[in-house]
Every structure is written in structure tokens, then in C-alpha cells.
UniProtKB/Swiss-Prot annotation:
SMART domains: CH. SUPFAM superfamilies: Calponin-homology domain, CH-domain. This is Calponin homology domain-containing protein DDB_G0272472. It comes from Dictyostelium discoideum. Residues 380-391, 439-452, 1362-1374 have a biased composition (Polar residues). The lineage of its organism: Eukaryota, Amoebozoa, Evosea, Eumycetozoa, Dictyostelia.
Length: 1508
């Protein structure tokens, strides 16, 4: 159903007063008011749509949806989507073409109806020359203002069409068109009140309506004020011939139009007239601009004389009102005979076909509009009518609101008689007519009053037949009259309408021209271009046919006037257009330029902001870095200050510590005793636990054996009742086959005997047979009773087992939950304890590092005081070294004890694991036996074998998971033990140098940790055992449950079988039982064989696993033994080396005495003979003495020389760069040949590195010497006396002295040369200072090592026959063997140097052995082999692989980073003092040999002291 009935006024501007005066004044009849009730009755009579119409409606609706058209313009939805539309009316006169194009646009904004204003106001306002208000939306598209029409289907028959139409013709009344005051275009809209709120598209199909021509058009139909001048002169130029009076009042006959219908059906058409109106809605009027009339001429009188009819389906004469139709459905209509039809020529821009949605447009180039508007062209074809009466037409003016509400229908018929006279001026040509389709649809029909509609249709069709006849007569008369008129004015206007440009009309009729006839050729030349561009192909043909006629004076004057006016107007419009276009272009260019400038400015501003931000960030970063550096420096100063204070406090408490050392030792001994006691208690506790575990296992074993025995007895009793031979097979598995054969043979004999007896019994009398049957029956009853008793006993036993299993399961669940809760609590407590310990360890580490730094700084502050108290400190140092050696020895003993304890714990753990494994194996075996016993009872289940296999697989999986879990727990326990061990060692190292209270606290903490660890291990073991027991119990309960279900099922089956067996014959039952027994026995034998095979396989598998575990354990034990053996061998080797060194030391001391005496003699002689120093001789002498002293130093035993290494820290720490250093001045020699001591700032600070020369018979001095060479403990790292971070090798700069080769001494056979090689480091040899020196020399030499490494072989020979061949040290080759004490001093020096070289060879060989196999490490010397730092990392990885991880994947590219990492790891985790600074090494072109030897010697000592 359609919702609304549209009605509005076409708003056009009023004509000027002059034009109104020229037009004849005619009265305007008031509009007829139609009440609301009458309108409701009329709308209720509309018929309902049929199925065919609904299908067409769907099709049209789809087309409109595809063309972006909305539903109903009358139902508050604009079908044009608020787009502009174009309606065109074109009239062709004679052979010329006159086209009138009307274009109007409407905005998107809709105005409400004037609901409260009565329709009579329209008449009053119109009579006063004012514009009436619009009763409908003020902004509607022009296509909505044209007419609502619909298309019908030509295939529908006439009867259906008559039946479908209802209640519309009753609204038609005769009306005449007022030519001057055309009040409105009347548009009727209907609404069915039942479905007025529907939002559907209610218009099934549009239909085009034909419209007749009219030769008169009021100027005021156009809303554009700019077009007023066009129509002012038009009325005077158009001739309006008069018509006879009898034709004015002839009724108009409505005829059907083929394929058109008001409501979309196929049988009926309904038309609404288009009336030109002076007043139309604001912003919704038809807008005709002058541009539209430049291409085709327009005849106003012809348009005003147009009439509107309803056409029947059978009518051949078609009248088309201005209407929009689809291009695909536009078909020319054949006019009746002798009737001229004016053709509408349309031109459509193909480029706008998509926007026009398939409608024909007359605009060749439509005006540009906004994107929200569309362009719609309307094509009109009108036919001539005899008069202008509207007797059967739609009422003139109607108003209604959207709700069908308060306003009544009204109409104003046009009765102007003069309008008919204008039809004489209209001529038509028999060209093809074109119909167009409107996209305005009316809704569906009502379903009410169908019978009344049929009756009313019959009356309408009778009236239409009469109208048809009258129309034919009128057409004939009109055709004749038009033909005469055409002949009269054909020659006059032939050339006038050749062009399509509209002319501006004047207010007066032009007079006849007296000028000469216009030259046609000149006119054609002047206007041919505009005519060719404006007209269509058909119009050109018509114009060419009519160019032959000669114009008159009247037409010439008219043409001249029109030509001038048109030419001026066209030029003005072209100028305006060009100017507007130029302005638009300029504006666009300006906008583009401004946009580019704006974008460039924005980009510039953004770049500046970004640059400022970056600069600010950079400055802020620099400021922050500077602040951090200041904070760091302030922090360092504060730390130095605190360190000084702490050093003072430590020095004050030093005496107190010495006093408390003895007490600490007593407490340590007590602690050791307490530790041993705790270990003993722990062992006792473990022994008790082991005994309790053994007792528990024994008890469980006894219980299980008892249960097994009872079960076996029960099974044996059952088997004895059925068959005695089966018991022998079960008890003696090895003789199973043999006994089975015997049993089968026995059964065969029994059967044979029974058969024989039976045969004999049959031969006997019948009494014997009856007796035998009676005996058989009694036997069967006894067996049945025994079987029932057995089943009852089994049932009771099963119920008891079920109850016990349920109780066990509940208890197990409770225990499991408790254990889980306790485990979670323990885990949380352990995590907290671990975090606490980690935090404490980190704090202690930081404190130790700070303490170390403080000690370093304190050494510098104590420099002056230590100089004054050198002798006292020396004595204290000796005591301290002795005490440290004692502490180290005790620590070593403690470490050995701890190692033994750990080994014992490991053995205990392995023993416990072995016991646990055996217990689990035993439990598994017992479980397997129980499973086998249960399996034997399941004799009749064929699928039992598969189920048991699945259970065994599941049990194996659970066992595997349990073992993995135990292994994981073991690994965690081992890691925890290792971590505890490391923590304990670190605490012990810190406790060695701490106070008494600290030592006691750490001992207590250690005891507590040990106790917690033991408790943790115990808890873990208990939890593991509980979890394993719980898993086994759960598994056993599940199996028992499955067994109960299976037994219940078997019992049910047994009962059924017994019921069946009772029905069978007794004899056959006995035979079947015997067969069943034999078969069951055979199956049992097979199952038993399979079980034995499976058991054998399981045992073999367990044996293999046990063997593998034993092999692993054996390998571990062997490795441990090898390690212990290696350590013993190393210890023995060290002892031998120590003995050898002691012997060498004795010899060296003897040589040293003699050598000193000779030196003193030589020096005295030189002082007497020489007063001036000869540089060359002095340098050579100093070098020789330095070599001798260095050899003596390096010839010390391992234990003795190691103490000197720690005192050489001044060689590397705090060294400044050699580059740019100011060369020192040469110092004068004293009388004794030494330099001035006060000019050597570090000479006093160097601690003597040689031992005291004892007397030959002084045993006490020998003992003191041996104590001096003892190793210091790792925990306490003391700096040497007089240590200063800025100290160097006593501030000697090799670049300050130009070394020269000296002459060989005459008394030596040793060749001493100074060689240099490119890219080799400079080496420095320090002068060893004796405790009781007689002569002090500072010697230096500069040599380069050979490219080949020294000999790595170390051969120990007796002292009397030992020789050192092929040794090299610092580039000085020596082949001189050792000589007895009577040899000259030069030979003694050479022998001492060879001994020193042998010590370096030992160190080098040890380093090679430790780094063997490491990729990228090849140690050949003490310089170039260590340059990249990888060798240091290899040493750290050798003794602590966990610190570095995988050696192959570890990055080793950065040299300085390798130095820092290796030195820090060695100091922190191995206890090797970092004598070498990585930053100083980075500045040197190569390694410094002596510094590297010092560090590596310290590394060697620490590793040997640690037992590696």
C-alpha cells in the first residue's frame, strides 16, 4: 500500500504588471473542497494488488535499489535521495523544432506541510498577485513535481484490469484551465489508513502518461528570476488563433495507455494532469534558465493548451504527460490517422547514464550539482486536443497531510475559454513519440470494497468508449484546421525555428517590417554553427526540408530582433562563464599555492621542533652523565674516607685480635670436636633409620609372605577339590610339563578304566545300572554343594577386600593431601630461605670487596708509619706468616676432613639408594606375584592376557616416571649440597680473618645449614617414599576395583551357565566338564609358560639395568680413585721437588757466601782504582750481578719462591703509562757502587725476597726459613709491606737509559749478549734484596726471548751430576754446567741462572698441561701466548668450568674484555689475587713478561694449595 498522496503547488515568480495587463483578465473559480471523510471513502475503495503486480513491484523495486533510489517520496523517504531532477517538455511545430527544457533542482532539506491553512487561501493570494504557501514539502525535486504515473503490463487482459480498478473516477470533475491564473499543478496522493506506517516501497511499477501539446506557457512557471526577460517578449511573438466555441466545452475522453497502470496491474491506467501554476512551493519550482533554451525553441501557447487524459488499454491514440520512463521501456506510440503529433527531441549525455539511473535527459551537458543530487531527464510527448476543458480530469487542487489527517481534498478547475483558441497555433509532425518513465511509485491497493469497484469500473469503461468516439471526431476536425494554419505560416516561420536557441519575448506584438527581404544564405552562415550544435538529427532534417520557403517581412523583422538580442545575450553569458571559470581557476591555484606553503611551513616547524628536541635530549644526556660522574667521584672519596677510618680502627684492634687468636683457636678446636660429635650423631641416626627401615621392610615382607601363604593355601585347597595334579604343576614350576604328562596319562587311564567299567556295568543287570546312576547323582550333588560353598566364601572374601580397599583409599587420600600441603609449605620455606641466603651472600661479597678496596687504600696511608716501624713489622710479619701457615695447614686438614665426610655421605646416600632400589624391586616382585596369582584365577577370560599387558605397561610407565622424579630430586639435592659446600667454603674463608664473634656466628650458621640440609634430605627421601607408596596403593586399589567388577560379571555368567547346564543330560554334562578341565589345564599351562617367559624377560631387563648402574658406579669409583691417585702422585712430586729445592738452597747459600766475599773484594779494589764511573763497565757489571741475583731468586724452591710472588704486586698495580713520561735524571754512584737511596722513592718499600743466610750449624735458622716459605691462606689477602698503588718496578724507565752491550768478563766462560727483535716486549729483572746484604745493586737488562719456547722436559738428576743444557731465559743462552763450590764466581752465577730457568720451565710445562686441548690456546712462552687473554680464560675454565660454560660457544674476541673477565673470575671464585691490571695491559703493545710470571706463579700456588 502506498502511504501518502502528494499534493503541492508549482511555485513560479509572478509576471510583471505590464505582462499581466496584456493578458486578458479571467475570473478564477474557487477551489472545490473535498472533506476528509470523502477522501477516506475514496481511498478505501482502491483494490488490492494481485500476484502479478506484486512480482512487477519486486522487479521495479530491485531496479530502483540498484539505481540508488529510495522507497517512497511520499512516505518520508525521498526516492531520488535528495538529488536534482530534470523535466523536459519539447514541442515541434511544423518542420521546425521548438524545444522547451525545464530544469529544476531541489535541496535535501524538506519542509513540513501547511497542515492548519485551508486551501481557499491559495485563491485569495493568487488573485492579489502573491505567492501562495506550499501545502507540501518546500524542497522537492522537479521530477516529484511532474506527475506520479505508473506502467502497466500489456500482457494482462482487460477483464482483470476492470476488476482491479476501484473508486478513482468518482473524484474526477470537469474543469477548464485558466490561462492567466494557473493556480497549481494538482497531484493527488492516496493513503490507506490500515498500513500508513509501513516503510516498504509501496509502488509496484511506474507507468508513463501521455500529454497533449500546448502552445502557451506562462513565464511565471519558471522560478528563476533571470528568465523573466525571455518570456516577456515570448507572448507577443506567439500568435494565438481562435477556435470555434463549440469545441471549447466538449468533454475530454480518457483513454487507456498501453502497458500503463496506476497501481501496476495490467488492465487499467490512471492519469493526473500537469497544470502550469503561477504559485509553487518555495525552492521546489521548475527552474528554467536561459541556457536551456539556447538549443531548442519553446512554444508557451502550445504548452499551455495541453490537456491531460486517462487512456484505456485498447486506445490507439496515446497522450503523454511529461513523465520519466526508463530508456529500455521507452517506445514510440503511433498517433491516430490525420493527427499531427509534436515530437519531443531528447538528448542525453552518455557519460551521465550511471547518475541518471537509466532515465532520459534532454540536457546535452547537464548543470553540475552536488554529489548528493542526481540528474533525471524527463521526456514528454503531447498530442493535440480539441478544447481545454477538464470535465473528466482530476480535481484541480488537493491538499492532504501525510497522516491522512485534518486537511480536506480541494480542487480548482480551469475554465478559461480562451485557452482553447491557442491550439490553432500548434502544429504537430507525424514523427515518433517517446515516452519516459517516472521513478515515483504509488503504493499497493486496498483489499476493501472489491465488489463496489467492479460495478464502478463497468461505468467507467462505458464512458471511455463514448469519449473515444468523440476524441476521434475532434482529432479529425483539429487536423484539418491545423493543416490550413500550417499552409498559411509555413513560409514565414520556416527559417525562424531552424535554430534551437530560445528567444526573449517582448510585451507587444511586432509590427510588419518594411525592410527588404533577408538574405537566407547570409543568415545560415551567421547562425549555422549554433544551430548545428543545438539541434538533434531529426530537427536538422526537418529544418533542411523547410529552408526552401521564402520569409516575409514580418519574419525578417522578428528574426533580426531575435538575432540581435540573442547574440548580445549569448556573448554576455559566454563572458560571464569565462570570467567565472577564470576566477575559479585563480582561486584553485591560490588555494593550491597556499596549501603548499602551509605544508612546507608545517614541515619546517616540525623539523625545527625535532632538532630542538634532539639537542635538548643530547644536552640532558650529557648533564646526566656529568652528574653521575660527579656522584661516582664523590662516592669514591667517601669510600676512601671510610676506608681510612676503618683502617685506623683495624690497626687499633690489631693487638686485640692477636690476643684473641689463641682463644679463637681453642674455640675452633671445640667447634671441630662438636662437628665430629654431630657427624657421629648423624651417623648413628642414619644407622638407626637404616635399621628401622630394615625392620619395616622385614615386617612388610613377613606380612606379605603370610598373605601369600594364606592365598596359596586357599588356591591349593580349591585346586585339590578339582584336580590334584594341578597343585603339583603350581608348586613345582620346573617339573610342570612332566607332571602334566603324568596327570594326562593318569586321566586317560582313569577314563579308560571308567569306560571299561561302564561297559561292564551295561552288561550287568539293570539294578546295577540304577545303583550307578544313584551314586552318580549323589556325587554331582556333593560337587554342586561344594561349589556353592566355595562361591559364598569367595563372595564374603571379596566384600571384605572391597571394604578394606575403600578404607585404605580414603586414608591414602587424606595422607596424600597432608603430604602435598606439607610439601608446599616446605617449598615456600625453602624458597624464602634460599632468597635470604642469596641476599646474605651478596651482602657479604659486597662487604668483602669493599674491605679489599679499603685495605688497598689503607696501605697507602700507612706508608710513613711503616717506614719508622720497619723492624717491628718485620718481626710481626714473620709471626703472622707463621700463624697464617698454621691456619692454612689447619684449614687444609679441615678441608680433607670435609672431603672425607662428603665422600662418606655420598657412600651412605648410594647405600640408601641401593636399599631403596632393592626395596622397590622387592615390592615390584611382590606386586608381580600378586598379579600372577590374580591372573591364575581368571582362567575363562580370553581377553585377560591383553589387559594384564596393558597394566604392566602402565606400571612400567609409572615406575619410569617415579625413577625420573627420584633422579631429578637427587640432582636437586646434589646441586643444593654443592651450593651449600661452596657457601660453606666461602664462609670459612671469610671467618679466617674475621673476629671471634663472627667466627662463632658463622659456625652456628653452618651447623644450622647442615642440620637443615640433613632434614631436607630426609624429608625429600620420606616424601619420595610416601609418594611411591601412595602410587602403588592407588594402583592396587584400582586393580582390586577392576577385579571386583570382573568377578561380579563372571559370577553372573557362571550362574547363567549353571542354569543351562542343569537342563542338559547328566552324562553329557560330565563329559563336557572333563573336556573343559582338559582344555582349561592346557590353557593354564600355556599361560604359565608365557608368564615364565615374561618373568624371565623382565628379570633379564632388570639385570641389564642393574649391570649398567653398577658399571656407572664402578666407573665413578674408578675415576675417584684415579683422581685420588693423581693427587697423591702430585703430592709426592711436590715433596720430592721441595726436597730437591732444599738441597739446592743449601748449595746456593754456600756459593752465595763465597760470592759475596769475592764481590766485596772486587768492589774495594774498584773503588780504590776508579774514581770516575765508566758507563759501559758499570752496565755490564750490574747486568751480571742482576742476572746472578735473579737466578738466585728464581732458583728458590716452590714453597720459598711463592712467598716472593705475592710481594711483587708493585710491578703491575697502579702503573702509569710509559708514553710521554719524563725521563729521570741519572744519579751518582756512592763509594760502595750504589745509587743514592733517597732518590729511589720505592726502594725502601720493597720487601726482601731472599731468605736469610743461615749458619752452617744453625738448625733454628733453617726451621725459621722453612716456616717463612709456607703458603698464605686464600681467605686473607694481605698487601706487601710498603705497597703503594702507584708503585712500579722501582720507577725504572727503559727508555731513559741507552743500553749497550758490555765486554765479557775475563773470569767467566759465559757469553752474555743483548739482542733485540722487532715487536717483542721489554722485560725487566728486579734485583733481589737479601735480609743481610753487604752490597745492594739495582740492575737492569733488556732482552728479547727467543721465538721458540724453552724446553718443556723436566728431568730430576742428582745434584752432583745435574746439568742444564739447552735452557734459555730472557734471550741469554747458557751452556755452562754447574760447578763445585770451588769454581769462580762467574760459573756460580751461570749455575744459579740455570736453576732459575728450570723453575720457569716447570711453571711453563704446568701451564701447558692445564690448557692442553683448548681451542685457540697454544702456550709457548710468557708473552705472546697470553696477549689475546684466551689462555687466562682457559685456566679459569680448567678449574671452574661452570663459570664460563661451554668453551666452544663462549665469545673470545675482545682482548681487554678477556683480561677483565679472567682476572675477576679468578680472584672472586679461585682466590687468585689480580696483580695485573687489564686497563694497563690494554695500553701496552705486548705482555710484560715478569709481571705475567708473577701472576701465573700466584695462580700456580693457589691451585696447588687448593688441592687441584
Amino acid at each position: 500500500m502506498f502511504r501518502n498522496i502528494l499534493s503541492w503547488f508549482d511555485s513560479t515568480p509572478q509576471p510583471p504588471p505590464q505582462q499581466q495587463e496584456q493578458q486578458p483578465e479571467q475570473p478564477l473559480e474557487p477551489p472545490k473542497v473535498v472533506s476528509k471523510n470523502e477522501a477516506r471513502i475514496l481511498t478505501d475503495q482502491l483494490p488490492a494488488p494481485d500476484s502479478q503486480r506484486s512480482q512487477r513491484y519486486d522487479r521495479i523495486n530491485n531496479n530502483k535499489n540498484n539505481n540508488n533510489s529510495n522507497v517512497d517520496p511520499l512516505g518520508n523517504k525521498d526516492i531520488f535521495s535528495s538529488s536534482p531532477s530534470t523535466s523536459t517538455t519539447t514541442t515541434t511545430k511544423s518542420s521546425s523544432t521548438t524545444t522547451t527544457t525545464t530544469t529544476s533542482s531541489s535541496s535535501n532539506k524538506q519542509q513540513p506541510l501547511y497542515e492548519d491553512e485551508p486551501p481557499l487561501i491559495v485563491h485569495e493570494l493568487t488573485s492579489k498577485g502573491k505567492r501562495p504557501p506550499s501545502p507540501i514539502f518546500k524542497e522537492e525535486s522537479s521530477s516529484q513535481l511532474i506527475l506520479d504515473t505508473w506502467e502497466i503490463n500489456s500482457s494482462d487482459d482487460e477483464s482483470n484490469s476492470k476488476n482491479d480498478f476501484k473508486g478513482f473516477m468518482s473524484q474526477l470533475e470537469s474543469s477548464n484551465l485558466n490561462e492567466k491564473y494557473i493556480t497549481s499543478n494538482i497531484y493527488q496522493k492516496y493513503e490507506f489508513f490500515q498500513k500508513r506506517d509501513s516503510e516498504e516501497d509501496l509502488f509496484p511499477s511506474p507507468e508513463p502518461i501521455k500529454k497533449k501539446q500546448s502552445n502557451d506557457l506562462e513565464k511565471n512557471i519558471f522560478d528563476d528570476d533571470d528568465d523573466d526577460d525571455i518570456f516577456k517578449n515570448k507572448q507577443s511573438t506567439v500568435t494565438k488563433p481562435k477556435q470555434p466555441q463549440q469545441q471549447q466545452k466538449q468533454p475530454i475522453v480518457k483513454k487507456k495507455v498501453e502497458e500503463e497502470s496506476l497501481f501496476g496491474d495490467s488492465s487499467l491506467s490512471l492519469d493526473s494532469p500537469l497544470l502550469a501554476s503561477k504559485s509553487s512551493p518555495p525552492k521546489s519550482s521548475v527552474n528554467l534558465s536561459p541556457q536551456l533554451f539556447k538549443e531548442d525553441s519553446f512554444d508557451i501557447d502550445s504548452f499551455l493548451s495541453n490537456d491531460f487524459d486517462f487512456k484505456s488499454k485498447k486506445s490507439n491514440n496515446t497522450t503523454t504527460v511529461k513523465k520519466a520512463v526508463p530508456i529500455s521501456k521507452s517506445k514510440p506510440q503511433q498517433p491516430p490517422q490525420k493527427e499531427e503529433i509534436k515530437e519531443v527531441s531528447t538528448q542525453k549525455d552518455n557519460s551521465n547514464s550511471n547518475n541518471n539511473n537509466g532515465w532520459v535527459s534532454v540536457d546535452e551537458k547537464p548543470k553540475e550539482r552536488s554529489t548528493s543530487k542526481s540528474k533525471i531527464g524527463i521526456q514528454k510527448t503531447v498530442t493535440v486536443k480539441s478544447n481545454n476543458s477538464f470535465e473528466n480530469d482530476i480535481f484541480g487542487s488537493t491538499t492532504t497531510n501525510d497522516d491522512g489527517g485534518d486537511n480536506d481534498f480541494s480542487f480548482t478547475p480551469a475554465t478559461t475559454p480562451s485557452s482553447s483558441s491557442s491550439t490553432k497555433a500548434t502544429t504537430t509532425s507525424p514523427s515518433s513519440t517517446t515516452t519516459t518513465k517516472s521513478n515515483i511509485n504509488i503504493g499497493q491497493k486496498s483489499n476493501k470494497s472489491v465488489d463496489q469497484a467492479d460495478q464502478f469500473l463497468n461505468d467507467i469503461f462505458q464512458q471511455e468508449e463514448q469519449d473515444k468516439k468523440r476524441r476521434e471526431e475532434e482529432a479529425k476536425l483539429k487536423q484539418q484546421q491545423k493543416q490550413k494554419e500550417k499552409e498559411q505560416i509555413k513560409d514565414e516561420i520556416d527559417d525562424l525555428f531552424k535554430f534551437s536557441k530560445p528567444t526573449t519575448t517582448t510585451t507587444s506584438t511586432p509590427s510588419k517590417s518594411t525592410t527588404s527581404i533577408v538574405d537566407i544564405n547570409s543568415i545560415e552562415k551567421k547562425f549555422s554553427k549554433s544551430a548545428a550544435n543545438a539541434t538533434t538529427t531529426n530537427n536538422d532534417n526537418n529544418n533542411n526540408n523547410n529552408n526552401t520557403s521564402s520569409p516575409t517581412n514580418k519574419s525578417t523583422n522578428l528574426f533580426n530582433d531575435w538575432e540581435k538580442e540573442e547574440e548580445i545575450k549569448v556573448k554576455e553569458e559566454l563572458d560571464k562563464k569565462k570570467k567565472i571559470e577564470q576566477e575559479k581557476k585563480l582561486e584553485q591555484e591560490k588555494k593550491l599555492i597556499e596549501e603548499k606553503k602551509r605544508i612546507a611551513e608545517e614541515k619546517r616547524i616540525s623539523d625545527e621542533i625535532l632538532a630542538k628536541k634532539q639537542l635538548a635530549e643530547k644536552l640532558e644526556k650529557e648533564r646526566i652523565e656529568k652528574e653521575l660522574e660527579d656522584l661516582r667521584l664523590a662516592k669514591e672519596l667517601e669510600e676512601k674516607r671510610l676506608l681510612a677510618l676503618r683502617q685506623e680502627k683495624e690497626l687499633a684492634e690489631k693487638l686485640k685480635r692477636e690476643r684473641l687468636e689463641k682463644e679463637a683457636e681453642d674455640k675452633r678446636i671445640a667447634q671441630e670436636i662438636e662437628r665430629k660429635r654431630l657427624e657421629k650423631e648423624k651417623q648413628d641416626q642414619l644407622e638407626k633409620q637404616r635399621k628401622l627401615e630394615q625392620q619395616r621392610l622385614q615386617k612388610e615382607k613377613d606380612e606379605k609372605e603370610l598373605a601369600d601363604r594364606l592365598e596359596k593355601e586357599r588356591i591349593e585347597n580349591e585346586i585339590k577339590e578339582k584336580q590334584k595334579q594341578l597343585e603339583k604343576i603350581k608348586l613345582e614350576k620346573e617339573l610342570a610339563e612332566k607332571k602334566e604328562k603324568e596327570r594326562l596319562q593318569k586321566e586317560a587311564d582313569e577314563k579308560r578304566i571308567a569306560d571299561q567299567l561302564e561297559f561292564e556295568r551295561l552288561l550287568k543287570l539293570k539294578q546295577e545300572k540304577e545303583l550307578a546312576e544313584k551314586l552318580e547323582k549323589e556325587r554331582l550333588e556333593k560337587e554342586a554343594a561344594a561349589e556353592e560353598k566355595r562361591i559364598a566364601a569367595e563372595k564374603l572374601e571379596k566384600q571384605r577386600l572391597e571394604k578394606e580397599a575403600e578404607e585404605k583409599r580414603i586414608a591414602q587420600d587424606l595422607e596424600r593431601k597432608r603430604l602435598e600441603k606439607e610439601a608446599e609449605e616446605k617449598r615456600i620455606a625453602q624458597d624464602l630461605e634460599r632468597k635470604r641466603l642469596e641476599k646474605e651472600a651478596e651482602e657479604k661479597r659486597i662487604a668483602a670487596e669493599k674491605l679489599k678496596q679499603q685495605q688497598e687504600l689503607a696501605a697507602k696511608l700507612e706508608k710513613e708509619r711503616l717506614e719508622k716501624e720497619a723492624e717491628e713489622k718485620r718481626i710481626a710479619q714473620e709471626k703472622r706468616i707463621a700463624e697464617e701457615n698454621r691456619i692454612a695447614q689447619e684449614k687444609k686438614i679441615a678441608e680433607e676432613l670435609e672431603k672425607k665426610r662428603l665422600q662418606k655421605e655420598e657412600q651412605d646416600r648410594l647405600a640408601a639408594a641401593e636399599l631403596e632400589r632393592k626395596r622397590l624391586e622387592k615390592e615390584a616382585e611382590e606386586k608381580r606375584i600378586a598379579q600372577e596369582l590374580e591372573k591364575k584365577r581368571l582362567e575363562k577370560e580370553a581377553a585377560e592376557v591383553k589387559r594384564i599387558a596393558d597394566e604392566a605397561a602402565a606400571a612400567a610407565k609409572l615406575e619410569k616416571e617415579r625413577l625420573e622424579k627420584e633422579a631429578e630430586e637427587k640432582r636437586i639435592a646434589d646441586e643444593a649440597a654443592a651450593a651449600a659446600k661452596l657457601e660453606k667454603e666461602r664462609l670459612e674463608k671469610e671467618a679466617a680473618a674475621a673476629e671471634e664473634k663472627r667466627i662463632a656466628d658463622e659456625a652456628a650458621a653452618e651447623a644450622k645449614l647442615e642440620k637443615e640440609r640433613l632434614e631436607k634430605e630426609k624429608r625429600i627421601a620420606d616424601e619420595a617414599a610416601a609418594e611411591a607408596a601412595a602410587a602403588l596403593l592407588q594402583q592396587k586399589i584400582e586393580k582390586e576395583k577392576e577385579e571386583r567388577d570382573r568377578i561380579a560379571k563372571e559370577n553372573k555368567e557362571l550362574k547363567e551357565k549353571e542354569d543351562k547346564e542343569r537342563k542338559e543330560q547328566r552324562q553329557r554334562e560330565r563329559q563336557e566338564k572333563e573336556q573343559e578341565r582338559a582344555r582349561a589345564l592346557k590353557e593354564k599351562i600355556e599361560k604359565e609358560k608365557e608368564r615364565l617367559n615374561q618373568q624371565k624377560l623382565d628379570q633379564e631387563k632388570e639385570e641389564r639395568e642393574r649391570e649398567q648402574r653398577e658399571r656407572k658406579e664402578q666407573q665413578e669409583r674408578e675415576e675417584n680413585e684415579k683422581q685420588l691417585e693423581k693427587e697423591r702422585e702430585e703430592k709426592e712430586r711436590r715433596e720430592k721437588l721441595k726436597q730437591r729445592n732444599e738441597q739446592l738452597e743449601k748449595e746456593r747459600q754456600e756459593r752465595f757466601k763465597k760470592d759475596q766475599e769475592e764481590k766485596e773484594k772486587q768492589l774495594k779494589e774498584q773503588q780504590q782504582q776508579q774514581k770516575v764511573i765508566i758507563p759501559t763497565t758499570t752496565t755490564t757489571t750490574i747486568r751480571e750481578r742482576s742476572n746472578s741475583d735473579s737466578d738466585a731468586l728464581l732458583n728458590l724452591p716452590d714453597s720459598a719462591s711463592s712467598s716472593s710472588h705475592s710481594e711483587l704486586v708493585h710491578l703491575t698495580l697502579g702503573r702509569s703509562k710509559a708514553k710521554g713520561r719524563k725521563k729521570p735524571t741519572r744519579r751518582e754512584l756512592t763509594k760502595d757502587g750504589n745509587r743514592n737511596k733517597q732518590n729511589i722513592p720505592n726502594l725502601k718499600e720493597l720487601k726482601p725476597s731472599t731468605v736469610i743466610i743461615p749458619d752452617d750449624d744453625d738448625d733454628q735458622s733453617q726451621k725459621q726459613q722453612s716456616e717463612e716459605v709456607e703458603e698464605k691462606p686464600v681467605a686473607v689477602k694481605k698487601m706487601p709491606i710498603g705497597f703503594n698503588p702507584g708503585m712500579m718496578m722501582p720507577k725504572f724507565d727503559p727508555s731513559a737509559v741507552k743500553l749497550k752491550s758490555s765486554a765479557k768478563p775475563p773470569s767467566t766462560n759465559t757469553t752474555t749478549t743483548t739482542t733485540t727483535a722487532p715487536q717483542q716486549p721489554v722485560q725487566f729483572n728486579l734485583k733481589p734484596v737479601a735480609l743481610k746484604p753487604t752490597v745492594t745493586q739495582t740492575t737492569t737488562t733488556t732482552t728479547t726471548p727467543p721465538t721458540t719456547p724453552p724446553s718443556s722436559s723436566v728431568q730430576l738428576k742428582p745434584a752432583a751430576t745435574r746439568s742444564f743444557s739447552g735452557s734459555s731465559f730472557m734471550g741469554i743462552n747458557s751452556t755452562t754446567p754447574t760447578t763445585p763450590p770451588t769454581t769462580p764466581p762467574s760459573l756460580k752465577k751461570s749455575a744459579a741462572k740455570d736453576a732459575g730457568m728450570k723453575a720457569l720451565d716447570v711453571l711453563l710445562q704446568w701451564l701447558k698441561d692445564q690448557t692442553a686441548g683448548y681451542e685457540g690456546v697454544n702456550i709457548k712462552d710468557f708473552t705472546s701466548s697470553w696477549y689475546d687473554g684466551i689462555a687466562y680464560l682457559a685456566l679459569v675454565h680448567r678449574f671452574k668450568p661452570s663459570l664460563i660454560g661451554d668453551w666452544k660457544s663462549f665469545p673470545k674476541n675482545d682482548r681487554v674484555a678477556n683480561y677483565k673477565l679472567a682476572f675477576s673470575l679468578a680472584e672472586k671464585h679461585l682466590g687468585v689475587t689480580a696483580f695485573i691490571d687489564a686497563d694497563d695491559l690494554a695500553q701496552l703493545p705486548s705482555m710484560e713478561r715478569l709481571s705475567n710470571i708473577t701472576y701465573l706463579s700466584e695462580f700456580f700456588k693457589v691451585m696447588k694449595r687448593g688441592g687441584f
